[in-house]
């Protein structure tokens, strides 16, 4: 059986038109399937988009389970990152406002407490306080 057929047998079409993979996923939620030809696990969305090796596949629907070729496009890592930022899916640390950063720099609270308050890592708080992030802002 061809790999694409194997994938199509295990999808569920949603009301938004996504073809959601119903099998195994990785820790980021992307569908995975065993390819007997190569002896490797491959990403379903890459197979369905006919992505060349080394390329980046973008999901217009932002659904990592989606295998619908109409929701997939080939792009660059930079385009994928820009898409993530524009859609608010980037690392939470990038969502801090300038006011948040200034409050972090001026706070006497612990890194642990501030990380919980702002929903970022302790390392992000540490980096802000040491000027390694948001260096354009000064106390």
UniProtKB/Swiss-Prot annotation:
Coiled-coil positions: none
A UniProt-annotated Pfam family: HNH_3
Protein name listed in UniProt: Protein 2.8
Species: Escherichia phage T7
InterPro entries, alphabetized: His-Me_finger_sf, HNH_nuc, Homing_endonuclease_His-Me
Any one GO molecular-function label of the UniProt entry: endonuclease activity
Gene3D superfamilies tied to this protein: Homing Intron 3 (I-ppo) Encoded Endonuclease, Chain A (3.90.75.10)
């Amino acid at each position: 059986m061809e790999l694409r057929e194997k994938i199509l047998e295990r999808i569920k079409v949603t009301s938004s038109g996504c073809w959601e993979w119903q099998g195994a996923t990785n820790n980021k939620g992307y569908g995975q399937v065993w390819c007997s030809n190569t002896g490797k696990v491959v990403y379903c969305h890459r197979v369905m988009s006919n992505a060349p090796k080394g390329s980046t596949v973008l999901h217009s629907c932002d659904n990592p389970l989606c295998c619908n070729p109409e929701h997939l496009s080939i792009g660059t890592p930079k385009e994928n990152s820009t898409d993530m930022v524009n859609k608010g899916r980037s690392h939470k640390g990038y969502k801090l406002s300038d006011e948040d950063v200034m409050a972090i720099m001026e706070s006497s609270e612990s890194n642990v407490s501030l990380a919980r308050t702002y929903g970022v890592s302790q390392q992000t708080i540490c980096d802000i306080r040491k000027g390694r992030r948001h260096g354009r802002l000064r106390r």
